Structure formats: C-alpha cells, structure tokens
Swiss-Prot record:
Residues binding FAD, per UniProt: 140, 161, 237, 254
UniProt note on tissues of expression: Ubiquitously expressed. Highly expressed in prostate tumors.
Keyword Protein transport set for record: no
Descriptive protein name: STEAP1 protein
Membrane in keyword set: yes
Assigned keywords, A-Z: Cell membrane, Endosome, FAD, Flavoprotein, Heme, Iron, Membrane, Metal-binding, Transmembrane, Transmembrane helix
Membrane topology note: Multi-pass membrane protein
Pfam family, one: Ferric_reduct
GO cellular component: cell-cell junction; endosome; endosome membrane; membrane; plasma membrane
TM ranges: 71-91, 119-139, 164-184, 218-238, 258-278, 291-311
Organism this protein belongs to: Homo sapiens
C-alpha cells in the first residue's frame, strides 16, 4: 500500500503545473498599483520518503509532457533571424571581396561575422519584447475596453515575452565576450603591425583621430550600461527574485528599465555607425550595412512608445486598463456584429 501511495503522490506532483510568472498573469484584469504578494502553494500532504527514483518522471507521463513549450516560438524566431543575418553578413564580408577582387576573408567567419550576427539578433529580440505591448495598447484603444479578448497570436506572443528577453540577454552577453576577444586574435596583431608600418612609411608622428576616439568611447560606454540593465532584467525574472517583489515593483523594472535598455542599445548601434550612414562604400552590392537593418525595428517600437506616452493617449489607456469602457465604440462593434 505504501508503494502505491508513493507512486500516486509522484504522479500528482508531476501533473501539477508550476505557478506562472508574474508577467504572465492576467494583464487585462490586474491594476498596476496592486502590491499584493503571490505565494507558491506548499505541498504539505505529500508523503516524503526517500527513494532512488524519487525525482524520476513516471513512464506514463514522459510522453505527455512538452519540452519547454513556451520557448518554441522565441527559439524559432531567434534561429531564423540569426540564420538570415549570418547569410547576409557572409555575402557582404566574404563573398563580395572574393567575387570582385579575389581576396579570401574566410578567416572572418568565426569571430567578425558571428559578432555582427549577435547584436542584430539581440536588439531585434529585445524590440520583440515590447512590440506586443504597443500592439495591445493600440487594440485596447480601438476596442475601447479591456474585456475583449486579444487575438490568439497576440496573446501567445505576450506570454512569451520573458523568453524573448532572456534570449536577448544571452546574445548580448555573447556579443560582449566576442568583442573583448578582438585584441587576442592573431589577425588583429598582424593588422596592428601593418598599420604601424604604414604610419612609418607616411611619416606620421601621431595617428590620433579625435572623432573616432570619441565614437568608440561613447558607444562602448553605452553598451556596458545597456548590458548591465539587461542583466538586472534577467535577474528579476528569476522566480525566487520576482516573488520577493510586489507587482508594482516588478512591473516598473520590466517595463521602464526595459525601454531604457532598448533605447541605450539603439543609441549604441547608431553611434557605432557614426558617419557610415552616408559612406557609399558601406553599401556593398547596393545592400545596406547590418546596423541599418538592426536599428529599424527598435526605432519603430520607440517611436510608438513615445506616441502612446503622450498625456492624451496615456490617460485613456490607463482608464481602459482600470475598467473604464468607451460606450460609443462598444455600441458600434455590437451593431456591426449584429449586421
């Protein structure tokens, strides 16, 4: 009888679903000012006996549980963006010199090409974290109520924002590590010797370029601050940390500081580009540089966020999310549905 009870308790434990994250709560019915703490249920009724297979999933449940279901969409999108960016960068950095001047730059693939893919994927995924919030606000303004359900694709997208953010942080950390490895590369040392030799041949005593120095100092500093804020967002998404925060504190960190990190990342990319926007040589085979494509979606998100932050729209959105309904728009939708 005891072994049967243990098996039953194990099945109950594996069938139970963990509590959702704070940002996955019913965002349509929760006020931002709520400060109540969410507690995990404590399973006191489970029989705690030591067994060798205590943490093994029962065989009948192994094929019924999905593997990381909320990570499927973010990983697929990240893989698609990374693959397309890699092929695009490979075409510009390696294939073009080989086809035009027969120069082989395949050594750039492991570090230089990959390090142009990583920031592109990171900032795009970070923009995809806050884009559904913009779309949801526009939908609520259009409907005039918060009680009408969002489309299924938007609802699914909003529930995977945490995963998009964690993947963005992962690619940002990789980008920082790859960037720090630049001076350790053998090819960089050879280039440094070549630059020194060319400076001697040109009789230049000083190779200091003022605007280039300022450019690098600024964009590196902004990149460090942006990565630090992303790290803070990643830490607060850990369940043990988020449980210690009120909903208002968690919402403030994830929404306000998240937009700040997106803004810093966008400025980081723009300052990295500096005067390359008007350089004809950057448009290889009439294709724009990678940084131009990378900042497009973040700029769109920031512009719409700024528009929705205007007092006339902000007040109406807050009223709708606190339960107010626009009767005129609701009546129009009811009449259209009846027709």
């Amino acid at each position: 009888m005891e072994s049967r009870k243990d098996i039953t308790n194990q099945e109950e434990l594996w069938k139970m679903k963990p509590r959702r994250n704070l940002e996955e709560d019913d965002y349509l019915h929760k006020d931002t000012g709520e400060t109540s703490m969410l507690k995990r249920p404590v399973l006191l009724h489970l029989h705690q006996t030591a067994h060798a297979d205590e943490f093994d999933c029962p065989s009948e449940l192994q094929h019924t549980q999905e593997l990381f279901p909320q990570w499927h969409l973010p990983i697929k999108i990240a893989a698609i963006i990374a693959s397309l960016t890699f092929l695009y960068t490979l075409l510009r950095e390696v294939i073009h010199p080989l086809a035009t001047s027969h120069q082989q730059y395949f050594y750039k693939i492991p570090i230089l090409v990959i390090n142009k893919v990583l920031p592109m994927v990171s900032i795009t995924l970070l923009a995809l974290v806050y884009l559904p919030g913009v779309i949801a606000a526009i939908v609520q303004l259009h409907n005039g109520t918060k009680y009408k359900k969002f489309p299924h694709w938007l609802d699914k997208w909003m529930l995977t924002r945490k995963q998009f953010g964690l993947l963005s942080f992962f690619f940002a950390v990789l980008h920082a590590i790859y960037s720090l490895s630049y001076p350790m590369r053998r090819s960089y040392r050879y280039k440094l010797l070549n630059w020194a030799y060319q400076q001697v041949q040109q009789n230049k005593e000083d190779a200091w370029i003022e605007h280039d120095v300022w450019r690098m100092e600024i964009y590196v500093s902004l990149g460090i601050v942006g990565l630090a804020i992303l790290a803070l967002l990643a830490v607060t998404s850990i369940p043990s940390v988020s449980d210690s925060l009120t909903w208002r504190e968690f919402h403030y960190i994830q929404s306000k500081l998240g937009i700040v990190s997106l803004l810093l990342g966008t400025i980081h990319a723009l300052i990295f580009a500096w005067n390359k926007w008007i350089d004809i040589k950057q448009f290889v085979w009439y294709t724009p540089p990678t940084f131009m494509i990378a900042v497009f979606l973040p700029i769109v998100v920031l512009i719409f966020k700024s528009i929705l932050f205007l007092p006339c729209l902000r007040k109406k959105i807050l009223k709708i999310r606190h339960g107010w309904e626009d009767v005129t728009k609701i009546n129009k939708t009811e009449i259209c549905s009846q027709l």
